[in-house]
C-alpha cells in the first residue's frame, strides 16, 4: 500500500452516499487498520430532533460510513477502484447520550478488528468529541464487501 498523503480525499470520493445521506464532514486520520473522521450534526437536517440534535441511533450510520471511509482509503492508496459494501449488523450499540447536539463536531473512529479474504470484516467503532476521551457511543460493526456487489444484491433480494 502506498503511504497515506495529506490532504486526504474528500469523503464523497470514498463513499457512495450523496446529498443529505452523506453525514461525514472530512477524514482526519488513516492507518492500515483504522480511520478517523469528523461529523457535525446540523440543526435543520432531515434527522434533527425537536432541539435540532441528531438522535443517537444515527450514530450507527456514522460508524458505518467511517468503516466505508477506511475501506475506501485502503482501496485508494492501493490504486484500486472503489467498491460497495454492506453493514450486516452490530453487536450492542451503546450510547451515553440521547442525541448529539447540533453544530458540535464529533470524532468517529473505526478500527478494524478482523477482515478475511472473502470480504467479511468486523470493526470496533467509537464516537466522541475532539480532545475529550469520554465516549458518546460505541459498537462493534459486522460488514461485508462482496467481490461483485450487483451479483450479491441479485442473489440476496431484500
Where are these regions (language model features)?
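Compact, glycine-rich, soluble single-domain proteins
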Residues: 51-70, 84-85
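Hydrophobic beta-strand-centered segment that forms part of the acyl-chain substrate-binding groove
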Residues: 69-107
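Polybasic, low-complexity association/targeting segments
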Residues: 1-8
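HotDog/MaoC-like acyl-thioester-processing domains
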Residues: 3, 69, 99-107, 111-158
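Short aromatic-glycine motifs in intrinsically disordered, low-complexity regions
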Residues: 8-18
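Small-residue-enriched segments and motifs
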Residues: 22-25, 88, 108-110, 139
Amino acid at each position: 500500500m502506498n503511504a497515506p498523503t495529506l490532504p486526504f480525499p474528500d469523503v464523497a470520493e470514498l463513499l457512495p452516499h450523496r446529498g443529505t445521506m452523506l453525514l461525514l464532514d472530512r477524514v482526519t486520520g488513516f492507518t492500515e487498520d483504522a480511520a478517523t473522521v469528523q461529523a457535525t450534526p446540523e440543526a435543520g437536517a432531515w434527522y434533527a430532533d425537536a432541539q435540532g440534535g441528531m438522535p443517537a441511533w444515527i450514530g450507527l450510520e456514522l460508524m458505518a460510513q467511517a468503516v466505508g471511509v477506511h475501506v475506501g482509503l485502503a482501496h485508494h492508496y492501493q490504486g484500486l477502484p472503489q467498491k460497495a459494501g454492506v453493514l450486516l449488523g452490530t453487536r450492542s450499540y451503546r450510547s451515553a447520550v440521547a442525541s448529539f447536539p447540533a453544530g458540535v463536531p464529533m470524532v468517529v473512529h473505526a478500527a478494524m478488528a478482523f477482515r478475511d479474504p472473502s470480504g467479511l470484516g468486523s470493526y470496533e467503532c467509537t464516537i466522541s468529541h475532539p480532545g475529550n476521551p469520554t465516549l458518546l457511543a460505541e459498537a462493534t460493526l459486522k460488514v461485508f464487501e462482496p467481490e461483485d456487489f450487483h451479483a450479491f444484491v441479485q442473489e440476496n433480494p431484500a
